[in-house]
Amino acid sequence: MEPIEQQLTELRTTLRHHEYLYHVMDAPEIPDAEYDRLMRELRELEAQRPDLITPDSPTQRVGAAPLTAFNQIRHEVPMLSLDNVFDEESFLAFNKRVQDRLKSTENVIWCCELKLDGLAVSILYENGVLVSAATRGDGTTGEDITSNVRTIRAIPLKLHGDNIPARLEVRGEVFLPQAGFEKINEDARRTGGKVFANPRNAAAGSLRQLDPRITAKRPLTFFCYGVGILEGGELPDTHLGRLLQFKAWGLPVSDRVTLCDSPQAVLDFYRNVEKDRPTLGFDIDGVVIKVNSLALQEQLGFVARAPRWAVAFKFPAQEQMTFVRDVEFQVGRTGAITPVARLEPVQVAGVLVSNATLHNADEIERLGLRIGDKVVIRRAGDVIPQVVNVVLSERPEETRPIVFPTHCPVCGSDVERVEGEAVTRCTGGLICGAQRKESLKHFVSRRAMDVDGMGDKIIDQLVEREYVHTPADLFRLTAGKLTGLDRMGPKSAQNVVNALEKAKATTFARFLYALGIREVGEATAAGLAAYFGTLEALQAATIDELQKVPDVGIVVATHVFNFFAEESNRDVIGQLLAEGVHWPAPVVINVQEIDSPFAGKTVVLTGSLSQMSRDDAKARLVALGAKVAGSVSKKTDLVIAGEAAGSKLAKAQELGITVIDEAEMIRLLDA
């Protein structure tokens, strides 16, 4: 090794060591000036020998040339969100649900952490070297922010220590400390730049810069809180153990992590953090509470898009006072008419609020609200502004009552309020432009029919120009007709037509969800599809039969029954099928009468499938008598591993469960 190579290696090792002490251990050994001197020395040596620069060198954080757009990264393991609770009663109910599902009367050991108010990211290390990073995005696909993440000094470009997995994807939060936020805004005011409303917006704006050199100038930091992909290595079997292992490898972890052995201990942690919140130096909006045992997490599983073993306990939202200048009425997808207060703009929790939901007529009556009133505004969950109460002692003389419409403000149809419901609805159905727009936007959305490129503005124009009345009309659109829309050229129009054609191939569950039946979300649609198997069987089902589907009660069953009883709905479904919308047909077989390797088996899918979608695979497996589970356990009979299979594959191998690949699955399906 040349002398300069030895110098470079020693300098990089020294700098990484001090980065670890500063960002992870919070115990710097040297002044910032000494760190800067070492960095300058490294830069000078690398300038002499650029052929010896390595990708994981501390100098390589500054970033490359600006990007023109962000590429997309598909999360191999979805980045799920958490359910929220906002008070002690709700948390205790969550705790009881967990105990009931575990069939245990013993206290659960909870791992409690801060809920950081930043931007969720995933970072992939291969053999300990940072290779990619992405935003959460929609949970399935995020933006490639690798170049920007490399500029954040708290994030190691190379992990250190022993037993580092071959592939390790860590999840965490990028955020901006309060001091850094104030400095950014101070500089912006001085130079005439953009002033951010709050640290979270500043962090998101900094991380999503197309020019990494701008990101490098922002004092972003990072805390790690979870794992996605894990291949070629092992992690401890508790959440806290994993956090400690991450810290040992050089990843920053919050020091406010506590194990709690009772619900009361969790509440004490929550109250202590809430008390300390103003002095933390960075924004949080609650605490995150997770079952510490990975085995129990696996046993609890997931519901829809959130784990059953974790919850975010949010702090009470910040409140401000302002005036209601007017009330307008919006019409939603199902005809629900929602009153919205137009406010004198006011800053609430760092965000300028000018509108607030009033929910329904009962809420207006409860508040005793009049137009012109002074009100208290809260951001519920720090997201949706709402009116908390009227400041009656300061009611102006000139206020006027809020009159709920007797006719739809959009189409003029009669409105009705069903006895026992709080919501007033427009009776116009799809003749109502507002309902038509919202229904069509739902129909083409990513988790429904997934029509790429069919955005809200296109739907608005299609409805306003009377080109489209029902979802079936979408599939009759031509490139020529679309070209006439604003900002829609021939190429874009053809892309939309192609996307519509592609969307015709769907799944029964997606199709049901896309129809927009009241109270039928993704999970319920999947349950209905799996239980009945065919559209014909579902349409013929009685209310009693519908209630046999897991998680379907009398209310949902009635909505589903009424939807299919409506002739106009059946007509639209018929038109959609006539236009070529289709999904894999289930083969209804008596499990006891067939010789299928899947019959009666509990099967788990993991990794990415290339020959068919995961939904298609599930549908075909279920049709052959399999039960498709979401996690691997001792009860699992078979694991089907696609590309980039992760922890489920490792778990299956550990338990000695039979594993086959996608090609073998297809061979067996077609046998």
Curated annotation (Swiss-Prot):
The keyword Ligase applies. GO terms for molecular function: DNA binding; DNA ligase (NAD+) activity; metal ion binding. Keywords: DNA damage, DNA repair, DNA replication, Ligase, Magnesium, Manganese, Metal-binding, NAD, Zinc. The active site is at K115. Its cofactor is Mg(2+); Mn(2+). PANTHER family: CHROMOSOME TRANSMISSION FIDELITY FACTOR 18 (PTHR23389), DNA LIGASE (PTHR23389:SF9). Belongs to the NAD-dependent DNA ligase family. LigA subfamily. This is DNA ligase. It comes from Salmonella agona (strain SL483). The gene is ligA.
